[in-house]
Amino acid sequence: MTDDSRSIELEVEVPGTPEEIWAAVATGPGIGSWFVPSTVEEREGGELVQQFGPGDSMTVRGRVRIWDPPHRVVFDGGDEGVGMAFEWLVEARHGGTCVVRLVHSGFGSGEEWNDQFDGLDAGWRMFLHNLGLHRRYFPGQVGVAVQPLGMAAVGLDEAWGTLTGALGIPAAPSEGDQVAAGPDAPTALAGTVERAVPRKLTLRIHEPGPGTAVVAVEGTDGQAAISVWFWLYGADASDRAPALLEGWQRWLADLFPVPD
């Protein structure tokens, strides 16, 4: 059962025209530049396909329920009134910016939904901040998402300590700090801390290339999801992405091995 009164409602102000911001939140290349690789049939009733990690099990399919460019798009699972829905609203402001509003609805009632609600709320805050970085520093460009992901049956704080220790970066840096991974990381990783909250860092990077990155531990104690995600820009970003994914995916698997 879903609770119509329970939804995540967030907004962020980003630079750009409504048409530019629409492209960022309603089209496949735009969404993939700050969130996850996506394809969108740009019409009402069209298909949405999103890839949340390596493998077919991480592919999620949905529907374009409402398509009203450049101001409103709604994605859902395809069944009217059932499951989650994601409404994006774009409103122009003076000075060349727009407010992007997200309404994520369709949560179930009951305490068993609390962890998922809180986790998704925190995740959306992280990704909306990344949307702002995409528009602020890489306007007019398309980013390539690279999504190494690990899992660990440990507490979240323990996983964060293990991850940051292996990377050789501070566990609690301040915004504006410069950080760089140490020699044990599979590739270079260096940049400016743009956002720092418990167990989540967002970086504007210059290594392994221009772009943004997220270092995060999410989930619940005993089911920790570990991410070192990149959004790369530049003419060779697509060429560099497969090797980057392979190297970091292997590194995370070695750092957080699955018990026999």
Please place each PLM-identified region on the residue numbering:
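Beta-strand/loop substructures that line and gate deep hydrophobic ligand-binding cavities in soluble
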Residues: 74, 78-120, 194-260
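Short acidic N-proximal helix/loop "leader" segments that mark the beginning
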Residues: 1-7
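Solvent-exposed alpha-helix faces
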Residues: 26-27, 129
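Short, flexible helix/strand-to-coil boundary loops that buttress conserved ligand/catalytic motifs
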Residues: 25, 35, 77
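Short, surface-exposed charged micro-motifs
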Residues: 11, 63, 87-89
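Surface-exposed beta-loop interaction hotspot
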Residues: 106-164
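Short beta-edge strand/loop motif at the mouth of beta-sheet-based domains
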Residues: 9, 16-19, 28-63, 68-72, ...
